[in-house]
Amino acid sequence: MKNAALLLAAAMLALAGCASAGDTAAASEAAPAESTAESAAAEDSTEAALPGEPHPLSAYSACAVSGSSVYTAVSHFSSSEDSLGNFDHSTVYKTDLTTGQTYEMYRTGSQLTSAPLIIDDTLYFICYDGGMLALPTTGGEARVLPFSYDDWMPVFYAGHYLYCRSVSAAPFCRTGGMRFNLENGETSPWNIPVETMYIPDVVGDALLLCRVVSDYPVPYPDDDEMSQALLQNTTLEYTLADPATGAVRQTCFTLPYDIPQPGSLTIYTYLGKCGSDFYFRADQCDDEYALVSQSVLRIGTDGTRTDLGITKTPDYLDYCAVLQGDEVRWLLTRGTDGIYLIYDTQGHEIGRNKRPAGLEAFFPLCMLDDGRLLMVVGYDWEHDSAARYAVMDADEFLNGGSAYREMTFAE
């Protein structure tokens, strides 16, 4: 695995703002179409060229993996009577998968995102109360850089720069971009189309960028009746865009961002990529907007769509992807009987497993470079309820086995 970022996706997406963006979009299917709308670019950035290869901020929400090390921040909430439930501190833990031990690296009074961005020998954690913690992995003094969590959503990094889009985004705001220097906290403008709704991934040297396409320019008006009418005629266009300039290189596919009648609502959630294919979970809702069924779509960069034919009822948990690095390897869901169903990227069932008796958790976070799984097998209540990690052979999991090597907390 590259020494890449595995940043808390949930924290990046749970931001307040006037955007209706995120990893989901209310939509019903439409055939791929070339956009006729012109994309307005933001102000020119200080430097057009990227300072290095672009890397995505991956969907692993609980931890960051670099080589044989796993890093995570865990929030501790007070259990004392006078401050019950109040945030108390965050602890950064490192797990060495070679030695099999987890130990405390750092403690702070700021609440941190769970998974850091890792560049070289430094961990970068966003602080919910403002700023960004830069923590060396090899020792040395921690620094706090100025960063506004309420205003900016990180989307990828290149070199020692973090590229962010504004939390206030299309279609009800004009989307802006910012380049953040991770060495000194300085900022500069970054080119991004003002119609950008969200940027779910990096594909090679391009961004997978979702933008609003409409005859009406953003921002849409606050008037509810007018905005609803506009949304019914708005298209969500997924493109491959230049990460430095925001210029569209290729239109891949489109989905209408409409306000459907009850019974015809489909909500798409981006799961990840594998090669030149993108994977979306499609949630079908009924007249009361309750979930009826869930399926997985594979959409190519040429717009070709394939329903993988693994539709499930609400009795199953949401489909999720098991990634190795930046690529989807498996699709996973679990029924009310507790049995995990595992599928390959073509939609073929390749295995089943069930949580062993006595374990409070048993699920794969990701696939490591060597093909083993990083598992969560429980939580340690004496260490801020931190996850108890284990490594497990992938074939063992696919074949329904339960043999794994658990990490232990160093005292």
Model-flagged regions — what are they?
Residues C63-N86, L117-C127, H160-P171, D205-P219, ...:
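Short beta-strand elements that form the blades of beta-propeller/WD-repeat-like
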Residues A14-G17:
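C-terminal motif of bacterial Sec signal peptides marking the signal peptidase cleavage site
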Residues T254-T333, Y340:
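Eukaryotic tandem repeat interaction scaffolds
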Residues A31-S61, S66:
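N-terminal low-complexity, Pro/Thr/Ser-rich intrinsically disordered segments
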Residues M1-L8:
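Positively charged n-region of N-terminal signal peptides that target proteins for export
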Residues D44-H55, E81-R107, D129-F147, A170-P193, ...:
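Surface-exposed loop/turn elements that mediate protein-protein interactions on large endomembrane-trafficking
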Residues A19-G22:
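Bacterial signal peptide processing site
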Residues L57-S66, S110-D120, Y149-G159, P193-G204, ...:
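Repeated scaffold domains used in trafficking and secretory/extracellular systems
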